[in-house]
Amino acid sequence: MDKRSFKVIVVGGSIAGLTLAHSLDLAGIDYIVLEKHSDPLATVGGSVGLLPNGWRILHQLGLRHQLEQEACPVKVAHMTYPDGFVFSDNFPAAIQERQVPEIQFPIGYMPANDERFGYSLSVLTRQQLIEVLYLGLRDKSKIKVGQRVIKIQHHQNRRGVSVFTESGQEHVGDLVAGADGVHSITRSQMWLQLGQKLDAEKERRQLVAEYSCVFGISSPLKGIPPGEQLIACHDNATVLAFPGKDAHIGWGLIQKLNRPCNSPATTQSSDGETALIMAKSAAGLGLCKDLKFHDLWVNTPKYSFTILEEGLFQIWHHGRIMTPNMAQGANTAIEGAAALANTLRRISQIDKPSEDDINRLLQGYTVRQQKRLRAVHAISRSVTRVHARQGRIKKIIGRYVYPYTPGAALHTFSRIIAPAPCLDYVPMPFPGPGWTRALVSGWSPISGVLLLVIPIIALVYGYSVINFGRDSINN
């Protein structure tokens, strides 16, 4: 099949959607992106963190240099505790740099000089990342703004699918890829078409919320300089702070809900009153020496509130509709887009692909990505609960185990990141030996990860799992 005769309709101009657009363009596949906002650069969300798995794909897309102008590399991470104890770890620098000291790892193997990935752990705003992705597109006319999708319909007597928008337009393509967040119209339409084959209510219940979050960007504060990450752990609450290059601080206040909830009606809130109540209750929480949450709050002109949902949908595709789980943070959104592009390229290479061809290849994608995301999902749950000191065991692990296992973060982080997918039809950069080691030794995302993974990843995925923006929450 001529790749340009195969057309993909991407729903959502999110981080995932724009990454997929770049990837399809490099594959020679025709596409359009339907974005509901009238401005493709609409300011939505707070800070995001780029990890090596996200960096590598963006490097393949030719965007590394532009992003390095915007992103602030993190060199050290600080964790603070209610008793005043502070633990600092320079593993963020060690992930990129070549000088890693020999360390005796108390639970076994800890390689010292083969786990760096050549990319920094970096912080930037979601707005900056979206701008780099959008402005880097070769053909911006393919981004259709003001196109809120209301219906997706498979063609009965011919190949393809139609997407209808609120403005009355119909867009025709061969396959629809949803990159429109957790509360996705693409997913809803897929569930509707599955009908009795799917217990939609059971699938919706895959998302459960136990925590809420207020997030924003504060003006600079003395004591939280660029290049440093701060995680303040308190009972049932956590404050995360990530200064950018301009010293403005992306932050998030995460608090445990009184009871879990999974109703969509209660999980799409932007309730300013609730945010104010949360902020007032947390005003006295210590961040670091001489700084409290109140100092961040009074220096933040704009903030948002959301419920943090956790879960992994089981059904990702039906017919010519694909809704990968692209809502686990910027890095897994980027991963998912690249892995989906690999699959769509294979479909486009088939002469007149049948429904069976499409289903077979999309199912293969689903199985591979679900296996990886199950590990990420398990880690993300643990991260939130260790940070919030939920229960005696997690308090002990976070306060008394993690700080005394030097090198553990570097080792475990490497095992999580190294097997990450990237574009398989674009030259693969190997800027650090960690990537090569993964291919040679066959690391898996969870091999060798014992109880220590909980506090270890608490620092690492403080950036990635809780990205305070549209890709990690909703569209």
Swiss-Prot record:
Annotated pathway: Secondary metabolite biosynthesis
MF terms in GO: FAD binding; monooxygenase activity
Example of a GO biological process term: secondary metabolite biosynthetic process
InterPro entries: FAD-bd, FAD/NAD-bd_sf, FAD_mOase_fung
Source organism superkingdom: Eukaryota
Glycosylation sites per record: 236
Membrane-topology annotation of the record: Single-pass membrane protein
Annotated transmembrane regions: 446-466
Locations listed in the record: Membrane
Major place of residence: membrane
Top enzyme category: oxidoreductase
Cofactor requirements of the protein: FAD
Any Pfam family: FAD_binding_3
Binding site for FAD: 35, 49, 126, 330
SUPFAM superfamilies: FAD/NAD(P)-binding domain (SSF51905)
Keywords of the record: FAD, Flavoprotein, Glycoprotein, Membrane, Monooxygenase, Oxidoreductase, Signal, Transmembrane, Transmembrane helix
Signal peptide: 1-23
One Gene Ontology cellular component annotation held by this UniProt entry: membrane
Protein EC: 1.-.-.-
Family that this chain belongs to: Belongs to the paxM FAD-dependent monooxygenase family.
Functional note: FAD-dependent monooxygenase; part of the gene cluster that mediates the biosynthesis of the polyenes aspernidgulenes. The carbon backbone of aspernidgulenes is synthesized by the HR-PKS sdgA, which accepts acetyl-CoA as the starter unit and performs malonyl-CoA extensions as well as regioselective methylation and reduction. The resulting nonaketide offloads the HR-PKS by intramolecular lactonization to yield the 5,6-dihydro-alpha-pyrone-containing hexaenoic acids preaspernidgulene A1 and A2. The FAD-dependent monooxygenase sdgC then installs the first epoxide on the penultimate double bond.
Protein name: FAD-dependent monooxygenase sdgC
Organism name: Emericella nidulans (strain FGSC A4 / ATCC 38163 / CBS 112.46 / NRRL 194 / M139)
Encoding gene, per UniProt annotation: sdgC
